Amino acid sequence: MAPNITSAPTGVLFEGDTIGPAAKDQQAEVNAPEAKKPREPYRRQIVWRNVILFIYLHLAALYGAYLAFTSAKIATTIFAIILYQVSGVGITGGAHRLWAHRSYKAKWPLRVILMLCNTLAFQNHIYEWARDHRVHHKFSETDADPHNATRGFFFSHVGWLLVRKHPDVKEKGKGIDMHDLEQDKIVMFQKKYYLILMPIVCFLIPTTIPVYMWNETWSNAWFVATLFRYTFTLNMTWLVNSAAHMWGSQPYDKYINPAENLGVALGAMGEGWHNYHHVFPWDYKAAELGNYRANFTTAFIDFFARIGWAYDLKTVPVSMIQRRVERTGDGSHEVWGWGDKDMPQEDIDGAVIEKRKTQ
């Protein structure tokens, strides 16, 4: 029930209280067609400004990749790779695991660092990113999912950014509880000044540093360190929404689309273990195993946990994982070898044992 709404008499006289039964029936007939009016079917509305922008970004990124191998200084290419890692952490460790899922807590110095890293990534401010991601998890693979993977690879990868949001996305987004982010002064500071911070952090600084620090050309700095880096980071993030919802194993829940995808995990800094993540979205590792090689974000969080800047790290006990694997998994859960309690009986029965020991 909404606040301040009760069934007790209030003393307020509404229009319906002043008319007789006959008039009420007549009024109901007038209002009935409006109440029963069918909902208009959703019609995709292309945002041509975004289409043109993303075409330019990808053409510029291809040119930037060419320059990285032909004329750009090695320092510029290395700088672009570092910025990709830094901005990626702003999404994975910041907007995603910290603010969208609250899988751990961070002291203000770390939150400031993650906010700046997130601004470098330029994927909307933290507040909007987290809200849309919470909607994605609560209404995954439905019309209320901002990047509904059932609408195809292209839509879930980038197409969702080229059209107006489905009405269900907007409607469900309004019902998402965002009070925790609204109380975070760092998040709200970024939201308020985003249109000032983002151009400076994402475009201006990455372009000027190579020019003034190691005498790079403006063209190489712009196309390699800025546009190639930015567009590459975007696509790595998008692969989580597209590829990781289509291809891979489902050891934790075979009834949902998200899957375990090593390639995506490597490119998206640990976000490719997506079947696990959708089953246990509150685990700060976003994976069952804390393998740093395929989950750089977990290494980042663990480092700051050691120095006390990250704390209250939430994870899942082995027993809970095992119960879920047995109940809904597809049988692809990893085993360490012969005799592992997770080894399927059909594998045991079908195995061939050669050179058996004789008495």
UniProtKB/Swiss-Prot annotation:
GO terms for cellular component: endoplasmic reticulum membrane. It is a multi-pass membrane protein. Expected to bind 2 Fe(2+) ions per subunit. The chain crosses the membrane at residues 51-71, 74-94, 194-214, 222-244. It is found in: Membrane. Fe cation 2 binds at H136, H245, H274, H278. It is an enzyme of class 1 (oxidoreductase). Its EC number is 1.14.19.1. GO terms for molecular function: iron ion binding; stearoyl-CoA 9-desaturase activity. It catalyses: octadecanoyl-CoA + 2 Fe(II)-[cytochrome b5] + O2 + 2 H(+) = (9Z)-octadecenoyl-CoA + 2 Fe(III)-[cytochrome b5] + 2 H2O; hexadecanoyl-CoA + 2 Fe(II)-[cytochrome b5] + O2 + 2 H(+) = (9Z)-hexadecenoyl-CoA + 2 Fe(III)-[cytochrome b5] + 2 H2O. GO terms for biological process: unsaturated fatty acid biosynthetic process. Keywords: Fatty acid biosynthesis, Fatty acid metabolism, Iron, Lipid biosynthesis, Lipid metabolism, Membrane, Metal-binding, Oxidoreductase, Transmembrane, Transmembrane helix. A motif (Histidine box-2) lies at residues 133-137. A motif (Histidine box-3) lies at residues 274-278. The keyword Iron applies. Fe cation 1 binds at H96, H101, H133, H137, H277. A motif (Histidine box-1) lies at residues 96-101. It comes from the Eukaryota. Its cofactor is Fe(2+). Belongs to the fatty acid desaturase type 1 family. The histidine box domains may contain the active site and/or be involved in metal ion binding. Catalyzes the formation of a Delta9 double bond, acting on saturated fatty acyl substrates like palmitoyl-CoA (hexadecanoyl-CoA) and stearoyl-CoA (octadecanoyl-CoA) with higher desaturation activity on octadecanoyl-CoA than hexadecanoyl-CoA. This is Acyl-CoA Delta-9 desaturase. It comes from Acheta domesticus (House cricket). The lineage of its organism: Eukaryota, Metazoa, Ecdysozoa, Arthropoda, Hexapoda.
